[in-house]
């Protein structure tokens, strides 16, 4: 593009500079008029923003600076470290400093990441702040908002202070429970939406004031009223290539793969609201997303009749950890898988074989420094960094949930004892996995027969009856290392003798477990075991051992293999939780005991009534098929959502095997245009589909009246240098703008561009033309100066070198605004010298080529007024100026500006011309006062075609 520059001395007088500049511009304009006698009508039919026409630049709505390049005429900045009221945020992006910014942000929300903008036509805008910190994992504490902003632009005439004022916000929320899946604030009354619920990237406002927002996690369309209240359930995107399917991203909540993260966010938010600790996630290890073909759920790989085949690759440890959720897996009994899980980065392992688990942890040295990573100075497992748990004590070494089983776990230095509880008739928590006292595990002390048909429910017997009747020392098939040899359990034998128990293998109460651990400490510290080889480690470990106690309760209302209703086999959830928690509190163990459950109702009760006790959320798929199984805990019940998760939605066995993730990560509705007639939305995917052989992006039509996609779609060809789009708007029925960008920041050789596009209902492929190179902008007045030391892209050769540029707004055919998404506190695209994070910048550009110009010479155009034949005489005047040569039937507007860009007189506003019309300006302003001498500019619009005339008042 040809450039013109002044040379010579600096001109001191601004008015003289403008006079010379104006003369120079008109010289260029005259050249353009000679070469083009007739101008095309611009394809432009959105409202023109007169606020900025009148206030920014003397061109008004006039001709572009052909051959001058795109000119920066105004700029405003919202500093990176700008905050609004709200809860603490950034808690899951780290701690300390990020690009010199202290994180997290305590008791405040950053005003950042503007992803889209809506013009209020009063000098203010609605700016959409995106999901927070860039991912579903780290943004659950970022509230989704629409901010009202007012830029005070530093302009071409160096007026304005270049700041952006925030005038308030609209918080997006779902108080009417229209969202069917789990959201972070699921259990709250207002249900404020967060960046872990949706990644909002585009917004349009309809005539009634409603907001439509495009999301990337679904992707979904979201419909809100003017106050930010959700009006409809999230609307998914149909996959027209696969009828009956949806186009989904991997974060889609209707797939199992991302559902656990959403549920854990909801459980944590509920816990925090009630002053409790963050819950731990505890999944079945074969359901981890670990790319291990040897770990899967057989009933998912080879489903019985009535169940779908589904992937077992569900729970991603890295994703959950990034979201701040600890992951402790169950039940792992072999060294190979233990080592794989240690490498994967789980925070704990629950095992039936504490002996093997101890070996694995003692030998784990990921950083290769010659020292085991999780062993402390005393040779014990440091539970603060890794939690090794003996499952039901040590199920594969001793009969489960007994004192000898707990003793074996302590002998092998497990820092946590995992166990299950039932509640007796007299309200005593007793160690037991099943609602019935099972004949396969127990026998009667008096030797009488006890078979399956004789089994009784724990809830129907008192604790005293159970302890005097049953001995739980049976050896189970398939557990070759399991033994009930009492010579291996000296502490349990001694404890039973001291407490006059009928056998060391009685079914102990929770209180007896706590007492037994105290007895164990004394046994090895000062008692008979004090001289043994491992005595010191054993009592020291036992003195700080933790307890992970499960509420064994089933909320299903169908029947088991006996015909009994599941939920009737135990006490109610509140009674269950209270019985266990009260024993924990009475023993001052609230810092060392967790309550875990597959039934999340009990966990919610614990949050509310016992916030000092941490909870653990168990996840597993043990389906009920016919009379077999108990449906723990993800399976639906008779087609209704699982009853185990306290109302939180689980899309049972809906995985990527059934509906592949065709939307790429961060590839959803980055841009979304509104048709200029206000009837359709045009959401645009940010990236091409997975597996696509082309670099084309899909645009779909959405009918606003019916709130449905109409089946029409278009392909947008992305430039080969680009990795994504940033925004999409329409300024006429067929024309629009799309921002394209690569992934670079701070690189003046990168790719950041705005394309004008043409949409034809009869063509699938969208046409495009480059309109603005955002790395080559002419800042002739050096509006962007001064900057910080080492800033790039400021000064005469201005650039927008940000990694994400996601907002464009059109004011008139010649003037557009562009905003970056500053990704606070991460991105450094401007301040590379200081390393400070990017600000939010709002720039106004006068375009070298106006929007809506015809790309080809159209046929059959009717005769129109030749705008360059219009005469303004005399152009040097005393009393008046006459505008003539305007044909009959034209729509005419004439506005007079002074040299500073201020409107002097609106002479005509869309008046119809008559035969040989002429119009007179009598040299007065809008207040009917005579104007002073000087240079004036008449901007003449005839049927949407613009020209300008220079006038000199003597």
Regions found by a protein language model. Give the residues of each.
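N-terminal secretory signal peptides that target proteins for export/translocation
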Residues: 1-12
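Sequence/structural signature of beta-propeller domains
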Residues: 33-255, 259, 273-276, 640-857
């Amino acid at each position: 593009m040809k450039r013109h520059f002044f040379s010579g001395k600096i001109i001191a007088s601004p008015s003289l500079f403008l006079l010379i500049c104006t003369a120079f511009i008109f010289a260029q304009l005259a050249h353009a008029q000679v070469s083009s006698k007739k101008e095309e009508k611009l394809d432009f039919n959105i409202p023109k923003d007169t606020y900025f026409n009148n206030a920014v630049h003397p061109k008004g709505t006039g001709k572009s600076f052909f051959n001058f390049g795109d000119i920066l005429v105004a700029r405003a900045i919202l500093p990176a470290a700008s905050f609004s009221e709200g809860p603490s945020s950034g808690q899951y992006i780290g701690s300390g400093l990020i690009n010199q910014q202290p994180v997290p942000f305590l008791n405040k929300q950053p005003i950042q990441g503007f992803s889209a903008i809506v013009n209020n036509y009063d000098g203010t805008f609605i700016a959409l702040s995106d999901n927070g910190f860039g991912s579903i994992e780290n943004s659950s504490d970022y509230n989704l908002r629409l901010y009202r902003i007012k830029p005070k632009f530093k302009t071409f005439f160096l007026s304005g202070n270049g700041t952006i004022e925030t005038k308030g916000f609209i918080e997006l929320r779902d108080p009417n429970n229209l969202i069917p899946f789990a959201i972070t604030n699921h259990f709250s009354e207002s249900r404020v939406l967060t960046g872990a619920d949706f990644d909002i990237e585009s917004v349009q406002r309809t005539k009634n004031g409603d907001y439509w927002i495009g999301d990337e996690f679904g992707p979904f369309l979201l419909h809100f009223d003017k106050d930010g209240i959700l009006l409809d359930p999230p609307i998914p995107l149909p996959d027209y290539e696969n009828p009956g399917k949806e186009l989904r991203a991997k974060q889609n909540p209707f797939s199992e793969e991302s559902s656990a993260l959403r549920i854990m966010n909801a459980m944590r938010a509920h816990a925090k609201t009630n002053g409790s600790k963050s819950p731990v996630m505890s999944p079945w290890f074969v359901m981890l997303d670990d790319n291990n073909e040897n770990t899967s759920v057989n009933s998912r790989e080879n489903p019985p009749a009535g169940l779908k085949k589904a992937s077992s690759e569900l729970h991603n440890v890295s994703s959950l950890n990034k979201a701040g959720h600890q992951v402790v897996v169950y039940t792992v009994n072999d060294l190979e898988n233990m080592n794989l899980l240690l490498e994967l980065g789980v925070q704990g392992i629950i095992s039936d074989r504490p002996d093997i688990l101890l070996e694995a942890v003692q030998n784990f040295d990921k950083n290769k420094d010659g020292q085991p990573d999780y062993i402390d100075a005393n040779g014990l497992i440091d539970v603060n960094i890794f939690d090794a748990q003996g499952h039901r004590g040590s199920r594969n070494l001793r009969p489960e949930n007994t004192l000898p089983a707990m003793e074996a776990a302590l002998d092998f230095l497990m820092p946590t004892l995992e166990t299950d509880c039932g509640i007796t008739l007299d309200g005593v928590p007793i160690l037991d996995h099943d609602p019935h006292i099972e004949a396969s595990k127990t026998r009667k002390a008096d030797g009488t027969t006890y078979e399956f048909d004789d089994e009784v429910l724990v809830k129907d017997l008192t604790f005293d009856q159970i302890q005097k009747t049953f001995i739980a020392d049976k050896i189970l098939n398939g557990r070759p290392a399991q033994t009930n040899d009492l010579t291996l359990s000296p502490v349990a034998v001694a404890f039973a003798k001291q407490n006059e128990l009928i056998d060391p293998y009685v079914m102990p109460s929770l209180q007896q477990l706590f007492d037994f651990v105290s007895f164990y400490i004394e046994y090895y510290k000062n008692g008979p075991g004090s001289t043994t080889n491992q005595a010191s480690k054993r009592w020291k470990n036992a003195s700080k051992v933790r307890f992970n106690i499960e509420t064994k309760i089933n909320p299903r209302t169908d029947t088991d293999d006996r015909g009994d209703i599941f939920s009737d086999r135990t006490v109610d959830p509140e009674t269950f939780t209270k019985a266990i928690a009260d024993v924990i509190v009475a023993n001052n163990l609230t810092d060392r005991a967790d309550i875990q459950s597959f039934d999340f109702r009990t966990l919610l009760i614990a949050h509310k009534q016992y916030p000092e006790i941490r909870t653990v959320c168990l996840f597993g798929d043990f389906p009920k098929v016919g009379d077999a199984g108990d449906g723990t805990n993800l399976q639906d019940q008779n087609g209704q959502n699982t009853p185990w998760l306290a109302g939180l939605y689980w899309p049972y066995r809906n995985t990527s095997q059934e509906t592949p993730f065709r939307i790429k990560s961060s590839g959803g509705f980055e841009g979304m245009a509104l048709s200029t007639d206000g009837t359709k939305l045009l959401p645009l995917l940010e990236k091409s589909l997975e597996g696509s052989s082309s670099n084309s992006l899909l645009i779909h039509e959405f009918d606003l009246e019916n709130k449905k996609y109409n089946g029409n779609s278009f392909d947008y060809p992305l430039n080969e240098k680009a990795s994504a789009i940033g925004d999409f708007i329409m300024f006429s029925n067929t024309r629009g703008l799309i921002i394209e960008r690569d992934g670079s920041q701070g690189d003046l050789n990168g790719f950041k561009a705005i394309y004008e596009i043409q949409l034809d209902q009869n063509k699938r492929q969208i046409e495009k033309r480059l309109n603005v190179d955002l790395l080559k902008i002419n800042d002739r007045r050096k509006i962007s100066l001064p900057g910080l030391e080492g800033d790039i892209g400021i000064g005469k050769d201005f650039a927008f070198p940000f990694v994400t540029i996601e907002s464009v707004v059109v004011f008139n055919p010649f003037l557009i605004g562009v905003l970056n998404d500053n990704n606070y506190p991460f991105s450094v695209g401007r301040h590379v010298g200081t390393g400070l994070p990017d600000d939010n910048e709002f720039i106004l550009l006068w375009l070298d080529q106006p929007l809506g110009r015809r790309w080809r010479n159209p046929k059959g155009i009717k005769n129109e007024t030749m705008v360059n034949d219009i005469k303004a005489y005399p152009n040097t005047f005393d009393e008046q100026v006459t505008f003539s040569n305007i044909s009959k039937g034209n729509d005419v507007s004439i506005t007079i500006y002074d040299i500073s860009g201020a409107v002097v007189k609106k002479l005509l506003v869309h008046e119809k011309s008559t035969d040989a019309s002429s119009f007179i300006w009598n040299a007065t302003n809008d207040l009917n006062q005579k104007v002073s001498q000087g240079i004036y500019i008449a901007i003449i619009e005839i049927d949407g075609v613009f020209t300008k005339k220079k006038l000199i008042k003597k």
